[in-house]
Amino acid sequence: MGRDTLADIITSIRNADMDRKGTVRIPSTNITENIIKILLREGFIENVRKHQEGNFFFFALTLRHRRNRKGPCRTSLNLKRISRPGLRIYSNYQQIPRILGGMGIVILSTSRGIMTDREARLERIGGEILCYIW
């Protein structure tokens, strides 16, 4: 049985944000690198560093936190996995959902690489809906 690396990434970022950790270590793969670039460009994370321990490469993400959060479960970063190995979800560019009226983003895997919903609409291409971030 294989591992769902995208679900592992989403879970580790969500858990670190809920626990108010400053940094998260994520294994380095091509898909994680593309998703981290999107998160950095959209402003959901502050900084990314690539480290190596032996033959193992990983990313160290610095999370962006709100200063005035109250309560243990109030998170500023919500991530939800949509398409999973057991049930793939595809969409054309016209039916890509808008998250919070455009405040959040949808990450898609298209024939031209991994991109956000705005980029996919501009290029008029659809693909597999990987996750929602708001």
Curated annotation (Swiss-Prot):
UniProt xrefs under Pfam families: Ribosomal_S8 (PF00410)
Record's keyword terms, sorted: Chloroplast, Plastid, Ribonucleoprotein, Ribosomal protein, RNA-binding, rRNA-binding
GO biological-process terms attached to the record: translation
Any single GO CC term annotated in Swiss-Prot or TrEMBL for this entry: ribonucleoprotein complex
Keyword RNA-binding attributed: yes
Keyword Metal-binding attributed: no
Cellular compartments annotated: Plastid, Chloroplast
UniProt-recorded Gene Ontology molecular function terms: rRNA binding; structural constituent of ribosome
Subunit structure: Part of the 30S ribosomal subunit.
Entries under HAMAP family matching the protein: Ribosomal_uS8_B (MF_01302_B)
Family, as annotated: Belongs to the universal ribosomal protein uS8 family.
Function: One of the primary rRNA binding proteins, it binds directly to 16S rRNA central domain where it helps coordinate assembly of the platform of the 30S subunit.
Name of the molecule in the record: Small ribosomal subunit protein uS8c
Organism: Populus trichocarpa
